[in-house]
Amino acid sequence: MERNLSPRRRAYDLAMRSLVWLCAGLTCALLLFLIGFIFYRGFPGVTWDFLSGTSSYIKDTIGILPNILNTLYIVLLAMALVLPLGVGAAIYLTEYAADRKVVELIEFATETLTGIPSIIFGLVGMLFFVQKMNLQAGVLAGSLTLVVMILPTIVRTTQESLKTVPQSYREGALALGAGKWRMVRTVVLPNAVDGIVTGCILAVGRIVGESAALLYTAGFGLVLNDFVTALHSSSATLTVALYVYANDRGRTDVAFSIASVLMLLTLVINLTAALTGRKLKKNGGTQ
């Protein structure tokens, strides 16, 4: 095909191809530089004592175990609350809602909420959950704020996954006498589970990397608390702790060490999402 091109068109095609490769190379180089720089500055400080210890200005020790646990608490609580809401809303919008105008309005609202800066969710969460409902800054207020923030993402990703299921599957199940819910439960959801799981894992990644919404709602506490105590006690996550140490003079190396841990977690979460989605899609295709 390229042999039939004129020299001018061939030169233009070569120039555009080179430009595309250059853009791709610069993007990869920037990503590798960012990861390498963070690991170079922070990874030497990631020790077992750093991961399993607690911070104390009196003893002059630094540890991020409380922040790791607070992050885990918020991830578990937020996902436990948002999954039934998000998946249920997506099933209703895709399978049950009859008024398309209402569906389009809700879809527009979810897309709009997805684009709102997270700091605004944090401000609203502080005013409503912390002050109005008197929950105090802690894991519970932070989790509820994140539920509101990531709910549109769960709804949209689940909707898109449900829409990929062929309509013939639904018609076949209904023709065999299955009820509406039985058809959704036994036919639609199993064929859409790969996209739903991938969306949930990516939502976990967003929770782990969130800081702005938690500054006002989860607090800055670096104290080790159990789950029940942390619900209503100031509990800094890894990202909030990174912010605290980055603004503390002389603690920049600690901030880079936390950034290294967060970078590893992000890479693991994204890799898990990719592998899980691929495996579930492969298993779904072989059934």
Q: What is each model feature region?
A:
Residues 2-22, 37-78, 99, 244-253:
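Periplasmic/extracellular loop-to-transmembrane helix junction in inner-membrane transport proteins
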Residues 55-62, 214-263:
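Interhelical loop and adjacent transmembrane-helix boundary motif
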Residues 69, 73-81, 85, 89, ...:
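Hydrophobic alpha-helical transmembrane segments of multipass integral membrane proteins
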Residues 78-110, 123, 273-282:
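Transmembrane-helix boundary motif in ABC transporter permease subunits
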Residues 79, 158, 180-218:
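Transmembrane alpha-helices
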Residues 93, 159, 163, 201, ...:
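C-terminal transmembrane helix and the adjacent membrane-cytosol boundary/short C-terminal tail
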Residues 111-148:
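Generic hydrophobic transmembrane alpha-helix motif, especially the helices
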Residues 117, 176-177, 190:
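Glycine/proline-centered hinge or cleavage motifs at structural transition points of membrane proteins
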